[in-house]
Structures are given as structure tokens and as C-alpha cells.
Design a protein with these regions (language model features):
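Polysaccharide-binding surfaces and accessory modules of carbohydrate-active proteins
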Residues: 25-60, 65, 77-286, 294-298, ...
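Short Pro-Gly-centered flexible turn/kink motifs
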Residues: 58, 137, 164, 300-318, ...
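Active-site-proximal substrate-binding groove within the catalytic cores of carbohydrate-active enzymes
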Residues: 58, 62-63, 500-705, 719-724
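Glycine-rich, aromatic-flanked loop segments that form ligand/cofactor-binding clefts
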Residues: 122-156, 315-329, 393-437, 513-524
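Extended acidic/polar, glycine-enriched regions
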Residues: 212-215, 276-333
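Aromatic- and glycine-enriched glycan-recognition loops and surfaces
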Residues: 348-429, 450-454, 494-503
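Active-site-adjacent "subsite" loops/lids of carbohydrate-active enzymes
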Residues: 394-399, 403, 407-465, 474, ...
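C-terminal beta-strand-rich structural cap/linker in extracellular carbohydrate-active enzymes
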Residues: 709-733
Length: 733
């Protein structure tokens, strides 16, 4: 009898184990599929984009998402499915886009007659009809996709992301629409879709080809989706309710200095749908209608035959609520659509007073393995001086740097300063300068602003500088001036200034210039933004900075690749603070100097080492050189995406892990001990996103190796000893 009890217990245990294993292994399987899907974050090459024309439908499908359109009686989206988990996102038919022309709203495509908006039954197709006032579908074209930015990297980047090997793989579908209305004769609207290989991602945007008459475009809504609600509430306002988690939206129209996209976004609108009369919310306030358009971009005048291009909307379908997985998905998106963000040169921030100091810094970079010098704010560089003497001076220094294989860059401020009453942003309320994001700021559409753009481009063309540190990028200021040549008035001022700023970044990137800019212009050509820190914290003690920097790294890489953010190391006094805050004299604080370097390089995050020099003695030089050599040895894996293991709290261990399932080194772990005593810990390490199966070999910083067998949950347990106030690293393959 006892034997039977044990046998029954064993069967139950086996059963539960199989259930757990099944749940883990089928989490990404397509509903109804006969095989387990490969996780695209680990093996993306299985999924190829295709555009299918079948009966009365056009279908975008890459094995990870499917978006389907009825063609007749007018084109309309009837299906938007995440194939990794079977989630149907669509509940209602909406227009493909909406445009407001000469104060009149027009629907682009779409069908009418859906009486129930909680769900869409395909058997209702025969009851749907088109409206004569709507733009009607005429035809389509299919092509391959290409980069939106003609990038030309001159700095280090992972081998598989350069333009010679990074082909933008996928398909483009363009849907063409026209109007039956005589007033819009010759006015063509094109709806563009990119579907990418290897990830559940679409890009959508609208182009307009004007006809023979001038028109005013007051709004272009380039995406409209009647989405299934994330949650219901009998009473509740839109801002109180969760939005659909199955789709992540990002556009190339974001700004506000927050160093995060979600806070910088100015285009995503979750609206109510009063035609959805069966919703649970009594006041019809469920946020279930997604629209994408800029808030402040009316009054765009189009001349006859002029072309207009809307913002680009990237739509990434999410299969999980897990923050780490969602972050990895977003980072994979950036690597795919903006591969220039993977460039990651090693630079110092030089504070210089004369040319001799620039040459000395270049020589120190050669001696230590640094790759670039950026003349920081407060240096003697002025890019706005277009005199022959100034250009020749800086070209000679750039030539000196290039002879030694060092890149040279510099700092220039656009916003957060005043130029003149004629060139500053004009406040619509007062009619005077002011009211800008930073209080006072120049208008990019003013004579000075347009001249600034041209001077920057000319400076880089003539001097052959390699890096631009553009502080105060255009932050979205509207301007009420009616005399600035770059915009007509208040209405079109934001749209026109944004295009000037984006055009400048695109031009410089195509010239091979690397761009640091503290605002969210990644999708139009910038490379790096601040990782996310409080500047005055660099006047705190080195001990505090060490912990705070590790917190910043964890927080700033949740949705950014390591290469997308810069950190900061004040070699000399910055923002106040005393001797306890700075590293000079460097040899006297060599332990803290090395700790800060290892933290940043161990995260793949380049810091701005701001000061007049990188070393002051041979001992310091050797430390810097050895740290750089270590980083370069593991550079590829250290630039892979980060999974946080434990956020720094100053009382226990903390650390992170890089993962690269396609690399030779599959993972790299950094452990830190903030306490004054050595620490031995037995830790669970999650290896699922390394793509490894069976066994994994760990090698630590002392060269010791050990092989581990992965559990069914893809985790292993290791015991690690971390030195007091120190660190330990491990590479896994």
C-alpha cells in the first residue's frame, strides 16, 4: 500500500513536470499549429515576409504577424493577428487613414455597416459598403524595403550591422487611393506598409501627391485601429484604464529631453469609440481606438503637385507582459530599423583651451586605445564660425587625429539660448520671445536657424570632423512669428522645424558623422542619447556615483541597446562638489577610476570621460590601457542587449547579463559587491535568451572554467564570490 502511494506521488510529480515543460515550450506556438514555433528573439531567420494576393484579399504575413485587407468594395483592414500567440487585435473596421484638407475630413479607404463593434465576424462581409465621399482604392505596388536613412558608418559597430551586410530584409506594399470628388481631382493618397523579416513588425506611413490646386493639410492620421480593449470598467475614464498591451507603437516624431520614448511621444492617441455601443463602460470611455498623428501640425500648405510625407509609425506586436522580454523586443526593433544605433566608438570628452591640448588628448587616446576625442562644452571650439581661418585651424587638427586613426568631434548648442528678438521663438500668448521648452530658444525656421543648419553641415564637410555632439536639439517649440522664412506661422511651425532638424541629422549621418544628441531622434539618424542621469549627481562623492551609475545603467538599458546611451565620468570638477567628487589626480584615485571604467565598459555603455587628460602617470596609463584591451577583447558580446539580474541598492550584490544567441560568446555577466566584505552567493542565472541548450561553459575573470547543465527552465545555479567593493565577470559559451 505504501508503495502504491509513492508510485501515485511519482506519477503526479511527473505529470506536473510535463505540464510545466509544455507551458514553457509552447508559449510562443501559433494556435492550431502542429509544431512549436521558434522564438524570434533567438532564431529570427525562420521568418520571411511575404505579401499574398488571394481572392478579394491582400495579406501581409511573416509567420509572426498577419494583417489582412479586403479589396472590394473598398480596401479595409479586417485582420491583425499576432501569430506567436494567436491574439486578434482588431475588433472593428476603420479607415486606412484620415486626412483633413481645406478644413474637410476625408477617410482613406475603409468600409461601413459594421453594426457590432466588439468583434468583427467575417461573415458580415456582404453587408459592408463603401461611401462615395471616401477615397477609394485604385491599385497597389510591391517592392523591397530600404533604410530611411542613408547611413555611412565610420566608427566601430558589430560586424553584422554595417551597410555592406545589413540588408533591410522584407517587403513594401503601397496602396494607392484617389477621390471621386471634383475638388480633389488629381489628389493621390498612398498608404505604405513595410513588413520585416524576422520580427513581428510593421511600419506604416502616408504620402500625398497634390493635384493642380494649392491646398492646406490640417491633419494626417496615418494609422487608425479599432483595437480590442485591454480591460473593461463599468465606470472609468480613458486615462484610468490600461491600453492594449499587444501592440507597441513608436514614430519618428518624438522629443522633450526625457531620454525615454514613451514620455517623448507626441503622436500616439488612445481615443474613445462612441460607435462601440456594446462596450462595458456606460459612458463609452474605453480607450480602444488608436490614432497616430502629431498634435501640433496643422496648416501645412501644399503647392500644386507638391508631395507630403507623414510621420512613420512602427507597430511591434507584443506576446508578453514580461518587462524584460518586451524590452528585448524593442531593442531588436531598433537594431533592425535603425542599425546605425549599434555604432559605439570609445571617446573622451576633452575640455580644452588651446590646440596643443587637443593634440595631447589625441596622443593619449592612441596610447590607451581610445578611439575619439570630442571637444566638450566649455572648450575653445566654435562650429558656427565659418571663417577660413577657423575652418583651416580645425581641419588641421582633424588631419592630425586621422593620421593617428583617431576620430575628432565637437560640441555645439542649438536650443536653450537666446539669439535675438528677430530669430527667437515667439510666444503666441505675448507676441514676444519666450514660451519655449527651455524658456528662450531660437526658431529653426528663422534666418539664424536656417543659417545654423547650413554652417554645421559646411563645418563638417570642410574640416572632415567625425562626431557631432548636438546639445539642445529642437525640442518641439511652436513659434508664432510670421516673418521667419522656414515656416508660415504658428500652425506649421513645429512640423517645419522638426523637418529641418531631422533633415540635418539625416544629412550628417549620410556623410559618416556620428551624432550624440539628448533627444529621441534615433529614427532619423542620431546614434546616442544620454543613458538617463541627473547631472548634479556628478558633484556627489565617487562612492555615491559608483552606485548611482550602476542604477542608471540598469534603468537606461531596459528599452535601449547599450550603444544607444552615454554615461558620464567627471575627471575634473563638474556641477560643483569637492575633491571627493572628482578623479583628479587620477593616480590618487585609480581604484575608483578603474571601477567606473569597468562598470561602463562592462555594460557596453560609453561614458563621457570629461577632463583634460586620460592619464597622469604610467601606472594610470597602464590601467586605462588594460581596461580598454579587456573591453575590446569582448566587445561584441559587451554590446549585446542587457538582461538585468539585480538593481544596485548598496546593500547586496547587483549585476546584469549581456545575451547574444547568434554570437560565439552567448552571454557575459557582470557581478558587483558594494559592501566592505567579500561576498559569496549562490545565484540563479536565466539563460533562455542565450539560445543555449544542454550545457553551458562558464569562464570567470581568473580563467577558471566550469560546465553546467541547463534545467528545463533554461536556468542554472552558480556560486560566485565577489570581492569587497569590487566586481567579478564571467563569459558564457
Amino acid at each position: 500500500m505504501r508503495l502504491n502511494k509513492y508510485f501515485l506521488f511519482f506519477l503526479l510529480l511527473l505529470c506536473f513536470s510535463n505540464i510545466k515543460l509544455l507551458a514553457q515550450e509552447t508559449v510562443y506556438s501559433e494556435l492550431g499549429a502542429g509544431e512549436i514555433k521558434k522564438d524570434w528573439l533567438i532564431e529570427s531567420h525562420h521568418y520571411t515576409a511575404q505579401i499574398i494576393i488571394k481572392d478579394n484579399q491582400i495579406i501581409l504575413d511573416n509567420g509572426l504577424l498577419r494583417r489582412s485587407f479586403l479589396i472590394r468594395p473598398n480596401l479595409a483592414c479586417i485582420d491583425y493577428t499576432n501569430l506567436t500567440n494567436g491574439q486578434q487585435l482588431l475588433r472593428s473596421i476603420e479607415p486606412e487613414a484620415n486626412i483633413v484638407i481645406n478644413k474637410t475630413n476625408y477617410a482613406i479607404g475603409g468600409l461601413h455597416g459594421q453594426k457590432e463593434k466588439a468583434y468583427l465576424n467575417l461573415n458580415w462581409e456582404q453587408s459592408l459598403h463603401a461611401m462615395d465621399a471616401d477615397f477609394y482604392f485604385t491599385n497597389y505596388t510591391i517592392s523591397t524595403i530600404d533604410s530611411f536613412v542613408k547611413y555611412n558608418p565610420q566608427t566601430w559597430m558589430p560586424a553584422n550591422y554595417g551597410p555592406s551586410v545589413q540588408k533591410f530584409k522584407g517587403k513594401q506594399l503601397v496602396l494607392h487611393f484617389a477621390s471621386k470628388l471634383p475638388a480633389l481631382k488629381g489628389f493621390i493618397v498612398n498608404v505604405h506598409y513595410n513588413i520585416y523579416d524576422g520580427l513581428p513588425l510593421l511600419c506604416k506611413w502616408v504620402t500625398i501627391q497634390n493635384g493642380a490646386d494649392a491646398v492646406v493639410v490640417d491633419r494626417v492620421v496615418n494609422e487608425v485601429l479599432g483595437l480590442v480593449e485591454e480591460e473593461s470598467a463599468v465606470v472609468g475614464k480613458p486615462e484610468e484604464m490600461k491600453k492594449q498591451h499587444g501592440i507597441y507603437i513608436e514614430t519618428n516624431y518624438a522629443f522633450n529631453n526625457s531620454m525615454r520614448y514613451d514620455i517623448s511621444d507626441h503622436t500616439t492617441h488612445w481615443e474613445m469609440d462612441s460607435t462601440y455601443t456594446s462596450q462595458v463602460n456606460y459612458n463609452y470611455q474605453t480607450p480602444c481606438l488608436l490614432k497616430v498623428y502629431p498634435d501640433k501640425a496643422p496648416g501645412i500648405e501644399l503647392a500644386p503637385n507638391e508631395k507630403f510625407t507623414s510621420v512613420r509609425t512602427f507597430e511591434l506586436l507584443m506576446d508578453s507582459y514580461d518587462r524584460t522580454r518586451r524590452g528585448l523586443m524593442i531593442k531588436k526593433m531598433y537594431r533592425t530599423i535603425a542599425p546605425w544605433v549599434t555604432q559605439n566608438p570609445i571617446f573622451m570628452h576633452l575640455v580644452s583651451k588651446n590646440d596643443a591640448e587637443v593634440k595631447a588628448a589625441i596622443d593619449q587616446c592612441v596610447a590607451t586605445g581610445f578611439e575619439a576625442v570630442i571637444l566638450s562644452f566649455g572648450s575653445h571650439l566654435n562650429m558656427e564660425d565659418s571663417s577660413t581661418q577657423n575652418i583651416n585651424r580645425w581641419k588641421a587638427l582633424a588631419d592630425y587625429a586621422h593620421q593617428k586613426n583617431i576620430l575628432l568631434g565637437g560640441y555645439s548648442l542649438f536650443s536653450s539660448r537666446t539669439i535675438s528678438p528677430q530669430d527667437d521663438v515667439i510666444d503666441a500668448k505675448t507676441g514676444k520671445p519666450g514660451g519655449a521648452f527651455f524658456g528662450n530658444a531660437p526658431c529653426f525656421g528663422s534666418n539664424w536657424g536656417l543659417g545654423y543648419r547650413d554652417k554645421i553641415v559646411d563645418f563638417f564637410k570642410q574640416t572632415k570632423f567625425d562626431i557631432w555632439e548636438n546639445d539642445g536639439p529642437y525640442p518641439g517649440d511652436v513659434c508664432a512669428s510670421t516673418t521667419h522664412p522656414g515656416h508660415k506661422g504658428l500652425d506649421d511651425s513645429q512640423w517645419k522645424q522638426m523637418n529641418i532638424q531631422k533633415g540635418l541629422y539625416q544629412t550628417l549621418n549620410s556623410m559618416g558623422v556620428y551624432i550624440n544628441a539628448p533627444d529621441w531622434y534615433f529614427l532619423d539618424g542620431t546614434h546616442k542619447i544620454a543613458v538617463g542621469y541627473r547631472e548634479v549627481n556628478f558633484s556627489l562623492s565617487r562612492e555615491q556615483q559608483i552606485i548611482l551609475n550602476r542604477q542608471n545603467i540598469i534603468d537606461g538599458t531596459k528599452e535601449k541597446t547599450p550603444s544607444m546611451g552615454w554615461g558620464f565620468v567627471p575627471l575634473t570638477k563638474y556641477q560643483g562638489g569637492g575633491p571627493e567628487a572628482v578623479l583628479e589626480p587620477l593616480q590618487d584615485h585609480i581604484k575608483d577610476y578603474q571601477q567606473l571604467m569597468v562598470q561602463y565598459f562592462g555594460a557596453g555603455v560609453q561614458a563621457c570621460y570629461r577632463g583634460p587628460r586620460l592619464y597622469d602617470t604610467e601606472i594610470t596609463r597602464n590601467m586605462v590601457r588594460s581596461t580598454i584591451d579587456w573591453y575590446k577583447k569582448y566587445r561584441t558580446i559587451l554590446n549585446a542587449d542587457i538582461i538585468p539580474l539585480r538593481r544596485a541598492d548598496g546593500r547586496d550584490w547587483d549585476g546584469w547579463m549581456h545575451v547574444d544567441p547568434s554570437g560565439t560568446d552567448k552571454a557575459f555577466i557582470m557581478f558587483f559587491n558594494p559592501t566592505l566584505a567579500p561576498m559569496t552567493k549562490t545565484l540563479t542565472i536565466p539563460l533562455y535568451y542565450t539560445g543555449m541548450k544542454g550545457t553551458a561553459t562558464f569562464m570567470d575573470d581568473l580563467g577558471a572554467t566550469k560546465k553546467y547543465t541547463l534545467g528545463v527552465d533554461h536556468n542554472i545555479q552558480i556560486t560566485v564570490t565577489i570581492p569587497a567593493s569590487g566586481y567579478k565577470w564571467m563569459v558564457i559559451n
